[in-house]
Amino acid sequence: PKFTFHGYRYIEISGVEHAPELEEVESLQYSSVTEFHGSLTSSHKLLNRFAENVSWSQKCNFINIPTDCPQRNERMGWAGDTHIFCHTALNNSSLKKFYERNLQAMRDLQTPEGQYPEIAPVGGGFGGITYECASIFMAWELYEQYGDIRTLEKFYPGMQKYMDYMKDKGLPGTKVNPAIGPLGDWLAPEETDLLLLWNAFYYKEADLMSRIAGALGRTEEQHQYEALAAKVKKFWNETFVLPDSGKTCNADGTLCDTQCSYAIALSYGVAEDRKRIGEHLIRKTRAIGYTVGTGFFGTGILNQMLTEQGAVEDAWKMMLQTAFPSWLYPVTQGA
């Protein structure tokens, strides 16, 4: 195709009689990211390369819309991929208008019933609550980063409509409407119970909506969302935490005990006994040799949650781990 773009490291030119000289080949860098606020340089060569890879990944995936990958034929605006990287992206670059444009696309694609799309701006996709939460999560992230109340004012009606849509989907609970799924901690080495995750996501939605309503001066709605959050939190801790050991469990009562279940519980604020949950996150991380056992939603918060529990050395060991799967393993393989 003549009118397209690709993320790549290497190119191959075929079908020509004479091999072109290197200086005859031109590569054009195109991105919505015009500059980065800062950079990271350390005494650790692999860590420096990792930081560089993050910057290039952001450049390549931010072309008019945030995409899931720049190098293959998909290159779609998956909402789950978008919201998990939002915090990092906003710390790296000034992207307020970029993300507000994405929020507008999600609102434009919202169904009459209130369901948000899993892909924007083209619509469609699948994923459920872990993807459809993106508008609430990102609107609040933008407000925290920039303090512009107009962002919340503009998108609050759509978020409120979505929360109304969620009322009859079975959350909090274990017998849920199929629309809640099907995706959880996507591509994780160890599987975390879907119902544990979906209820945790619902808690964060309700909690953030109470904060958003409070920021907008909508006191009655703030209290309603606070009550919903409290209800979900109570259910989550009674259902997904074993009372004796404090370990996480699946909806059927069997042991879950994954890094993601502990990291999500801490990061989203749904855990009642944060100290105990934090101890289990540290224990689990040590047990798997400081490798990464999380997927889409557990990975980005893992080191931060370890650090917040006072396990700075554990977080550092995980950051510098090169065994598979880890942050630096791809770098050792040439990434």
Outline where the language-model segments fall.
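Active-site core of glycosidic bond-cleaving carbohydrate-active enzymes
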Residues: 77-335
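Extracellular/oxidizing-compartment recognition motifs
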Residues: 1-71, 80-81, 97-100, 116-121, ...
